[in-house]
Amino acid sequence: MILATGSRVRLLNIRVKDLEAAAAHKFTLSITEPLTSLKRLRVIFDRNGFWTEDAGAVAIESLEDKRLVGTMQFYRSGPCIHGYEIGSILHDEYDRGKGYASEAVRLLTDYLFAQRPGCHRLQLIIEEWNDPSARLAEACGYASEGILRKAGYSSEDEPSDCFIYSRVRD
């Protein structure tokens, strides 16, 4: 099902044909489980289609060639927070810098605020070294709130500090 359409990309519910590409990226469909097994991905897909009240995953598809260029997820960031955290990844270096990610973040932000009345806050957590994602957050209307110390996960040796960005319902 198409969730939202922009000028470059559209967001869709995850489809069976998206699972193989998603499997190449550990945390692209779930932040709590590194999903790289096609068999495990299919079990979850068959159970709930990667869509629940508390979390969901979407495909980012290029309008130009109908190709899967990335995936996004949203999930409850905490039991007392009235909103979600959003994560995204473009699967191929080739697709970066084309505006796909920023449009996808804007589309999912608008979708969640429109479709989930109890959602009052969306947040992005971005590791300190990731300048392109920090610029993307600001370009999409997210405000920097501060630093989460030792919250990053990209290094196995030492967790890194992260910036937290949020956008609240108008």
Where are these predicted regions, by residue range?
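Acyl-donor (CoA/ACP) binding surface of acyl/acetyltransferases
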Residues: 1-30, 57, 61-170
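Conserved GNAT-fold acetyl-CoA-binding loop/helix
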Residues: 27-47
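Short, P/G- and charge-enriched loop/turn segments at secondary-structure junctions
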Residues: 45-48, 151-153
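Short loop/turn motifs at secondary-structure junctions and domain boundaries
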Residues: 48-54
